[in-house]
Amino acid sequence: MRILSLLVFATLLFASCNSSKKGMKNLDASAFVQLETTPCFGTCPTYTMRILKNGQATFNGRQYSKKQGDYVKVFSEETMQALFDRIVRLEMMKRPDIYDNPRVTDLPANVITFFDGKDSKTIRCRFEVPGDMLDLIKELRTLAEATEGWTAKENL
């Protein structure tokens, strides 16, 4: 009985480790994540960044963004692996469509769209956003707001 319990535990452990490693590999080649930031009454940067599974990214800076206009960049495979694995672990498709409180004013929103190759999910994050989603937003904003490696489309 003890050996059977140990075998069941080992099988479950192996299956859970294996499923987390498959995250990005299970996504269709057309998968992408997009971050859009919305304006506020102050100087909140507004932009849209889209990153494809293969690392190709586009950025469109509008108001108060360090980069104004259209930019492109290719992120490393390691960066993409970490990012898309995190998104898969977050189970975006099961999340609510909005985190907000309409009584709270003048907060910009971070709108995340994830497309896995078949289905897409857009989540508007403005108020009372769970910590794991805030971590994803922080990671996406760091990638978007960096100035290194982005090339203006007009310079291509």
Regions found by a protein language model. Give the residues of each.
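Short, mixed charged/polar active-site loops
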Residues: T46-T48, Q68-D70, S120-T122
